[in-house]
Amino acid sequence: MPAGRRGPAAQSARRPPPLLPLLLLLCVLGAPRAGSGAHTAVISPQDPTLLIGSSLLATCSVHGDPPGATAEGLYWTLNGRRLPPELSRVLNASTLALALANLNGSRQRSGDNLVCHARDGSILAGSCLYVGLPPEKPVNISCWSKNMKDLTCRWTPGAHGETFLHTNYSLKYKLRWYGQDNTCEEYHTVGPHSCHIPKDLALFTPYEIWVEATNRLGSARSDVLTLDILDVVTTDPPPDVHVSRVGGLEDQLSVRWVSPPALKDFLFQAKYQIRYRVEDSVDWKVVDDVSNQTSCRLAGLKPGTVYFVQVRCNPFGIYGSKKAGIWSEWSHPTAASTPRSERPGPGGGACEPRGGEPSSGPVRRELKQFLGWLKKHAYCSNLSFRLYDQWRAWMQKSHKTRNQDEGILPSGRRGTARGPAR
């Protein structure tokens, strides 16, 4: 039994005897009973169920007078390990008693094997010992419907969790105002505590859902969850996600996808999220403000870098539902790279302004500030990108105009203040 609480039953030899594989089957196939072997004996109580921390007084009584099977020659094993002789005492010539205190939880959900042996090691009788806790009421029930065709729910066993006993969980559901109780049948679909209802679900009518837990020491029932299928809809990840460059812009990528086809016949809205990361990183950056668009431009990216992009969908407002939907899984990653930068880096031979030329430092600083702010956000708003494109167009036009002016002026007067001719 696990060392959750210490007790004499936990003390035993370190190496189990060769009979262990056979003993592990006793509580599954049935422990030996009177008349099952050459030496007949009975263990009492038979297959007890006890709370953790309880004590047990068991006896092994030999029937008849088989040679070598007197009480003085008997001994006990628990899960294949011989128990210390000081835990036993002879009651009479044919009965050996065993006292175990402060029992730990069972090491096997099917019960621990308590076996009475003759002097030569043969098995006389066995009993299954169940030590654990009653179940607590299940909590944290959550459910979702894939494209309004089914319902999947999962839960957690309770605050304490482990009972050390086989505990059966049943998910029950019914229409709120009428109908009979139904029991979910497809368990463990998305984890150990989950169940899937594949069909025959009603829309526009609330359901009541709860979970019942039962084991040898008792039962518990969760609180009732009331939900409408339309309020817990999720869907498949957006298909056909495409990521491409935005012309020669070295810090941007364009992302496009299509709406979930499974919901094309239903009146609903959708919210989308995008996340992206660089090729050699595991950290994702999430873009939340995509709203109901099916395209987005990521900005503030690193030039000459491979990015992985994923998209997911949250359908909401189906048939007028007021509640937010449930996010789908992320789409499969799609990769694309930004163009390499053609601008020289620090110390890379950038031309400094010639003496007397007007410096474009203030404009460059302002642009740098704008781009620095943009890199902190990945905007998917068309207005934001129109503004950004206008900014770039204005800079190019301003630069071109300045170059034309400088080409008209005589070389001696370039960069000087313009004023009325004297």
UniProtKB/Swiss-Prot annotation:
<feature type="disulfide bond">
    <location>
        <begin position="143"/>
        <end position="153"/>
    </location>
</feature>
<dbReference type="GO" id="GO:2000672">
    <property type="term" value="P:negative regulation of motor neuron apoptotic process"/>
</dbReference>
<feature type="glycosylation site" description="N-linked (GlcNAc...) asparagine">
    <location>
        <position position="382"/>
    </location>
</feature>
<feature type="region of interest" description="Disordered">
    <location>
        <begin position="399"/>
        <end position="422"/>
    </location>
</feature>
<keyword id="KW-0677">Repeat</keyword>
<dbReference type="InterPro" id="IPR003961">
    <property type="entry name" value="FN3_dom"/>
</dbReference>
<dbReference type="GO" id="GO:0004896">
    <property type="term" value="F:cytokine receptor activity"/>
</dbReference>
<comment type="function">
    <text>In complex with CLCF1, forms a heterodimeric neurotropic cytokine that plays a crucial role during neuronal development. May also play a regulatory role in the immune system.</text>
</comment>
<dbReference type="InterPro" id="IPR015152">
    <property type="entry name" value="Growth/epo_recpt_lig-bind"/>
</dbReference>
<feature type="domain" description="Fibronectin type-III 2">
    <location>
        <begin position="237"/>
        <end position="341"/>
    </location>
</feature>
<comment type="subunit">
    <text>Forms covalent di- and tetramers. Forms a heteromeric complex with cardiotrophin-like cytokine CLCF1/CLC; the CRLF1-CLCF1 complex is a ligand for the ciliary neurotrophic factor receptor/CNTFR. The CRLF1-CLCF1 heterodimer binds SORL1 (via N-terminal ectodomain); within this complex, the interaction is mediated predominantly by the CRLF1 moiety. The tripartite signaling complex formed by CRLF1, CLCF1 and CNTFR also binds SORL1.</text>
</comment>
<feature type="short sequence motif" description="WSXWS motif">
    <location>
        <begin position="327"/>
        <end position="331"/>
    </location>
</feature>
<dbReference type="GO" id="GO:0005829">
    <property type="term" value="C:cytosol"/>
</dbReference>
<dbReference type="GO" id="GO:0019221">
    <property type="term" value="P:cytokine-mediated signaling pathway"/>
</dbReference>
<comment type="similarity">
    <text>Belongs to the type I cytokine receptor family. Type 3 subfamily.</text>
</comment>
<feature type="glycosylation site" description="N-linked (GlcNAc...) asparagine">
    <location>
        <position position="92"/>
    </location>
</feature>
<dbReference type="GO" id="GO:0097058">
    <property type="term" value="C:CRLF-CLCF1 complex"/>
</dbReference>
<dbReference type="GO" id="GO:0005576">
    <property type="term" value="C:extracellular region"/>
</dbReference>
<feature type="disulfide bond">
    <location>
        <begin position="184"/>
        <end position="195"/>
    </location>
</feature>
<feature type="glycosylation site" description="N-linked (GlcNAc...) asparagine">
    <location>
        <position position="104"/>
    </location>
</feature>
<dbReference type="Pfam" id="PF00041">
    <property type="entry name" value="fn3"/>
</dbReference>
<dbReference type="InterPro" id="IPR036179">
    <property type="entry name" value="Ig-like_dom_sf"/>
</dbReference>
<feature type="domain" description="Ig-like C2-type">
    <location>
        <begin position="38"/>
        <end position="131"/>
    </location>
</feature>
<dbReference type="InterPro" id="IPR050379">
    <property type="entry name" value="Type-I_Cytokine_Rcpt"/>
</dbReference>
<dbReference type="Pfam" id="PF09067">
    <property type="entry name" value="EpoR_lig-bind"/>
</dbReference>
<feature type="glycosylation site" description="N-linked (GlcNAc...) asparagine">
    <location>
        <position position="168"/>
    </location>
</feature>
<dbReference type="GO" id="GO:0097696">
    <property type="term" value="P:cell surface receptor signaling pathway via STAT"/>
</dbReference>
<keyword id="KW-0964">Secreted</keyword>
<dbReference type="GO" id="GO:0019955">
    <property type="term" value="F:cytokine binding"/>
</dbReference>
<feature type="glycosylation site" description="N-linked (GlcNAc...) asparagine">
    <location>
        <position position="140"/>
    </location>
</feature>
<keyword id="KW-0393">Immunoglobulin domain</keyword>
<feature type="modified residue" description="Phosphoserine">
    <location>
        <position position="219"/>
    </location>
</feature>
<keyword id="KW-1015">Disulfide bond</keyword>
<protein>
    <recommendedName>
        <fullName>Cytokine receptor-like factor 1</fullName>
    </recommendedName>
</protein>
<dbReference type="GO" id="GO:0009897">
    <property type="term" value="C:external side of plasma membrane"/>
</dbReference>
<feature type="region of interest" description="Disordered">
    <location>
        <begin position="332"/>
        <end position="363"/>
    </location>
</feature>
<dbReference type="GO" id="GO:0043524">
    <property type="term" value="P:negative regulation of neuron apoptotic process"/>
</dbReference>
<dbReference type="GO" id="GO:0043235">
    <property type="term" value="C:receptor complex"/>
</dbReference>
<dbReference type="GO" id="GO:0001657">
    <property type="term" value="P:ureteric bud development"/>
</dbReference>
<keyword id="KW-0675">Receptor</keyword>
<keyword id="KW-0732">Signal</keyword>
<keyword id="KW-0325">Glycoprotein</keyword>
